[in-house]
């Protein structure tokens, strides 16, 4: 089983997931990951949800999940029962730039939360209709519908990632702006300019 966070990285850039897999012994969290851990607390996330209008009926935090279907496991930040929306998977991130960013360039974050939702459904038999992406820095909550197309996209992505990594295939590079700040740029594309902070 691979970590759900690897699916998020694969959606962002397949090579990031590949390097996480092959360089696993030397893999270290990035600075934004460490900063996110420092400011994350259940009370903070709960407060953001409530200030966003959530009526939390029941809650569970740091929920271990696994999905045989997806070949993934991990720990969801939270699962809450909300008064009108039902069961929601909560994923906290250091920063979410905007709703538009989340649904375009930040879609990898949605895929991570949706993978946790599918694992929750498989493990516990619940039905999850919504995801809540919580932005810690600006105290905002973004609600995402677990649509049939999102479910299909996550299953397809997990299948594609697992096949690629099981076969040991290095995905082709996709040079772009995100490469400048990637923690694997020195291994993947050593010719990329050495500027920007690591992702």
From Swiss-Prot:
Catalytically driven reaction(s): exonucleolytic cleavage in the 5'- to 3'-direction to yield nucleoside 3'-phosphates
UniProt protein name: CRISPR-associated exonuclease Cas4
Domain of life of the native organism: Archaea
Family: Belongs to the CRISPR-associated exonuclease Cas4 family.
Known cofactor(s): Mg(2+); Mn(2+); Cu(2+); [4Fe-4S] cluster
GO biological process: defense response to virus; DNA catabolic process
NCBIfam families xrefs: cas4
Keywords tagged on the record: 4Fe-4S, Antiviral defense, Exonuclease, Hydrolase, Iron, Iron-sulfur, Manganese, Metal-binding, Nuclease
Function: CRISPR (clustered regularly interspaced short palindromic repeat) is an adaptive immune system that provides protection against mobile genetic elements (viruses, transposable elements and conjugative plasmids). CRISPR clusters contain sequences complementary to antecedent mobile elements and target invading nucleic acids. CRISPR clusters are transcribed and processed into CRISPR RNA (crRNA). This may be a 5' to 3' ssDNA exonuclease.
Annotated cofactor note: Mg(2+) or Mn(2+) required for ssDNA cleavage activity. Can also utilise Cu(2+).
EC supergroup of this enzyme: hydrolase
Binding site for [4Fe-4S] cluster: 13, 179, 182, 188
Sites where the protein binds Mn(2+): 77, 91-92
Any one GO molecular-function label of the UniProt entry: manganese ion binding
Signal peptide (from-to): none
Gene source species: Aeropyrum pernix (strain ATCC 700893 / DSM 11879 / JCM 9820 / NBRC 100138 / K1)
InterPro entries per UniProt: Cas4_exonuclease, CRISPR-assoc_prot_Cas4, PDDEXK-like_dom_sf, PDDEXK_AddAB-type
Enzyme Commission number(s) from the entry: 3.1.12.1
């Amino acid at each position: 089983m691979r970590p759900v966070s690897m699916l998020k990285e694969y959606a962002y850039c397949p090579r990031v997931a590949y390097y996480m897999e092959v360089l696993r012994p030397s893999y270290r969290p990035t600075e934004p990951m460490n900063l996110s851990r420092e400011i994350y607390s259940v009370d903070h996330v709960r407060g953001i949800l409530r200030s966003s209008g959530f009526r939390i009926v029941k809650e569970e935090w740091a929920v271990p999940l696994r999905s045989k279907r997806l070949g993934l496991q991990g720990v969801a930040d939270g699962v809450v029962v909300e008064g009108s929306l039902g069961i929601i998977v909560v994923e906290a991130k250091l920063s979410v730039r905007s709703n538009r960013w989340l649904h375009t360039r930040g879609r990898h974050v949605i895929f991570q939360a949706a993978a946790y939702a599918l694992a929750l459904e498989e493990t516990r038999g619940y039905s999850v209709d919504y995801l809540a992406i919580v932005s810690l820095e600006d105290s905002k909550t973004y609600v995402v519908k677990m649509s049939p197309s999102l479910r299909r996209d996550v299953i397809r992505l997990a299948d594609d990632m697992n096949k690629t990594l099981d076969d040991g295939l290095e995905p082709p590079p996709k040079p772009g702006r995100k490469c400048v700040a990637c923690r694997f740029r020195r291994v993947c594309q050593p010719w990329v300019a050495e500027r920007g902070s690591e992702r």
